[in-house]
């Protein structure tokens, strides 16, 4: 039986830190579904369609990876629906862990068969957060070390649209 996991996030934008966690997940699971979720509590720079397109572009050469969009509903229900037994979460620092730990307990209550797997990215990505990358890029800073070239191009386009 193939081991399947989901890797959810808003991915606004999809960073090299996200990619690092995905690569680590692929060392454990045969199939990983990157789930792009809408989060009404966050102000997105990119539309969900743009985030889906960038994520598909970044991950297109990774066997075992698919990209899906979750417009609404509970992540635990989605995991059950697709037959995933694990939810992958990247944890960069203690603050991330505190939030993710609470979410993992809730998801386990909703879907007892699911396990949350916490993966730490390479140390060079521990300070890379989408919110920081967006801010630096929109102010004209160089974020090329932190995102795939297609994401960088999309960020340049967004900056031009806003100026």
Curated annotation (Swiss-Prot):
Coarse class of the protein's main subcellular location: cytoplasm
Coiled coil: none
Subcellular location(s) of the protein: Cytoplasm
GO CC term, one of those recorded: cytoplasm
Family: Belongs to the bacterial CoaD family.
Family matches, as PANTHER family: PHOSPHOPANTETHEINE ADENYLYLTRANSFERASE (PTHR21342:SF1)
Protein name: Phosphopantetheine adenylyltransferase
Organism taxonomic ancestry: Bacteria, Pseudomonadati, Chlorobiota, Chlorobiia, Chlorobiales
